[in-house]
Amino acid sequence: MTKAAELAKMGEVLTNSQLGGRRNIVINGAMQVAQRGTSSGTGGVGASNGVYPTVDRFIFEAGNTAGRLTMTQETISDLSGFTKAIKLDCSTADTSIAADEFLMLGQRFEGQDLQQLKKGTSDAEKVTVSFYVKGNANATYTLELRDNDNSRSNSQEFSVTTSWNRVSMTFDGDTSGALDNDNALSLKCNIWLHGGSTYTGGTHTSNTWHGTTNQRVGDNQTSFFDSTDRTFF
């Protein structure tokens, strides 16, 4: 995945730089900075929760799964305008999915950096997330905005093919639940890669803010851990 960089208010120019005071919220969306190293190593990701394996700012949340993956920063030449991407590669499959299993890749945001979204007011702003993605085979995953202050979520499914595809999704503003104006975690932008029925068991309604745990993941979700052939860029 590259350029998960574009999380910004609807109507703003979605770039990696500021323009006329408009700014992108995601940091390191072009995947260029990897101060911790360019590879997660052979042990694999999935055993621990809250891990930053390689590229700066991108965190894995994982729990209760036997599946494992490796994460590397890759140099690419097949996507115009970009030289880096992350590659996720399934190293251990998990096809017996318990209810409470989960795996997400995402970025976290402090409430003080999100007050321009006006969440919890009648003037709540829409949010657009856009990025490029590809994989070894067709797949469907879920992108979620998770309000950590009020335990609310809004999610939409997106498709992956074997070629680079630009995904762009706009999320409605949420008039319920203001974000705290401080330096604590308030919002997560998560890509769901794997989830059990605790998160998938309900009927998913796209682009709707809610507080129901089993509706966080889309009905057509692919498990990244379904095969050791599975990759995600």
Where are these regions (language model features)?
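Extracellular and organelle-lumenal recognition/adhesion modules and their flexible linkers in secreted
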Residues: K3-F233
